[in-house]
Amino acid sequence: MSINPNETTTGFNQLLETPDTMELAQRIIENYHNQSIQQILEINGKYMSDADRERVSNGVDSIKAVEHTPEKGYTGFYLLNNGRSSIEVSAINQLQMERSTKHETNHFASTNREIIVPQPDRRGYNVYQTVGTRQASWFHSNETGKDSEFSSKGRGLNEGLTTMYTNQQLMEISKEKGETAERQGIYGHATEICTQLENILGKDTLKEAYYGGNMQNLESKVNSIAGDKSFENLREC
């Protein structure tokens, strides 16, 4: 993939500046999202189904730059809801916006599945959702419009893989960007475990699970090495 000449050491300090307007921030994250999709498909498209490659190539349904709110504790957010995908990224400096956009774009590019099971007796429906290696479920009430009975597993492994792939992709663009992202230590413990897991199992097994949805192979390999039920513990790292 091509490298923007502004993304050299000379222009690196410019990436630490905050955009003057939200309109500019919006254009910046849209550009980073499109660049990320191109890079992810080039590197990892082979692990995806034809339908997923098409979904990813079309981009997320909604992407928005938002004012940064430190008390939220995050700079980016990905949501899959009723088959619609959306990303929000805090308008901070361009370096952080690129990392956050790439991180959330990886969530979008990972396995995204949503099964809705009607529950007419309860006047609502159950949702069973997979994003990457994280699985979640909940009940939605048509009467109140509210969700309840939340259940989730695999968030630790999912965030560790997402951060590891984000850092690797930034390193492909620029060593300086990759090392800066690594120093931030985002999901540090989970990322370190995923890095060790990649060294043991190889890249393909993890990427087939994350981008391709083949969790059974990953679970089987982990359990064969570490013992039965080890994968369930690993998922919550």
Protein language model features and the residues they cover:
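Pan-zinc metallopeptidase signature
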Residues: N13, E179-C237
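Auxiliary, metal-adjacent structural segments of Zn-dependent hydrolase domains
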Residues: Q14-L95, R113-T130
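Hydrophobic (often cysteine-bearing) scaffold residues that line and stabilize catalytic clefts
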Residues: T21, A25, I29, E98, ...
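Active-site recognition of the HExxH zinc-binding catalytic motif
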Residues: R99-I116, E159, T163, N167
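Substrate-binding clefts and substrate-entry loops adjacent to catalytic sites
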Residues: T144-E149, M171-E182
